[in-house]
Every structure is written in C-alpha cells, then in structure tokens.
Amino acid sequence: MKRIGLLGGSFDPVHLAHLALARAAAAELRLDSVQLIPAANPWQRAPLRASAGHRLRMIELAIDGEPQLAVNPVELERGGPTYTIDTVRALPADAHYVWLLGTDQLANFCTWRQWQAIAGHVDLAVAARPGAPLAAPAELASWLAAHRRRLIRLPFSPMAISASDIRGRLARGASTAGLLPATVARYIARHGLYR
C-alpha cells in the first residue's frame, strides 16, 4: 500500500519552505509521494489574495520535475468553506495517508471540525525542530492514547519564510530572492500578482 503525505495550505503563494517541508517529509517518513492541497476558502484564515487558478498553477510550476511531489486540487474542486475532514473523507482508500502539520497547527488541531475523525483517518506528522519537545494539546494526547495512536515527529528546522512576508515584499516591490522558486517568481511578475 502506498504511503502518501498530505500538506494542506493556502499556498498564497507557494514558497521554498513549503517545498522543503514536502521533500523532508518524503525522505524522513519514507513516503511514496507528498500531495500539496491548496485550500479553496480556509475557514480560519483571512481571504486569499490570489485566485484558486493562480495558486494551483504556481504549485504546478513549483513542483515541476519533482516526481515525489504532486498537487491535489480536491478542495478547489469542491469549493466553498474548506474543512480538512471533507478532504480526508474524499481520499481514495487504496493508500495510507499522513497529514503534515506544523507545531502551530498542532496547537489548535482540536479546534478543527471533527478533529477526532481526521485523526482516525490519517496519521499526524508534526514538523518540529530537531530535539524540541513535541507536545500535543491535552485533549488530542488523551484521544491518541485511547486509540493507541501517536504523533509522528518529522525533524525539520523552521525556515524564516512566510507567505505574508512574501506578499508584503511584492507589494512594496522588494526582492523575494531566496524565498520563491524562480518559476513561481516569474509567474507572479508576469501576472502582476500581490501588488
């Protein structure tokens, strides 16, 4: 059975830290592939700046030539509010799935709609600084223990890259060198995004 990592996000825009995390997950967790899942309308976030079509195309450009990385447009195709539970329920049953989280997402995981069902459908891998403690919220820790499940640690040193910083730089006309794949930077410039 294939092992597939799932990395959800707004990808507004996709940047080098997203790609580094996906590559690290594929290698460290021995995944057959990692799917980047752009959100249609994330319920816990501010409105997105780039259209779904632009965000999807930027991901396609960013992962071109990386066979272990793929884009899964399931949330864009569904439209409306984006809930992870709907996404995991729509996944084909012929693979084992690992949902990739950051420590910030882990801290508020129990606020996600039907979080227990999500944790029952997929394994949870948390990108954490090597050597840093990995602490699940008490409610999640209790649920995991009761269901004989555990968090998977994904050693990953955080990178000082954020989509909001990139959008700010682009709006000011500042450099984004070292933050975006070159193909994505060219696409953004060609389409005048984030100005």
From Swiss-Prot:
Record-given protein name: Probable nicotinate-nucleotide adenylyltransferase
Top EC class, one word: transferase
Disulfide bonds: none
Entry keyword set: ATP-binding, NAD, Nucleotide-binding, Nucleotidyltransferase, Pyridine nucleotide biosynthesis, Transferase
EC number from the UniProt entry: 2.7.7.18
Pathway: Cofactor biosynthesis; NAD(+) biosynthesis; deamido-NAD(+) from nicotinate D-ribonucleotide: step 1/1
Catalytic activity: nicotinate beta-D-ribonucleotide + ATP + H(+) = deamido-NAD(+) + diphosphate
Underlying gene: nadD
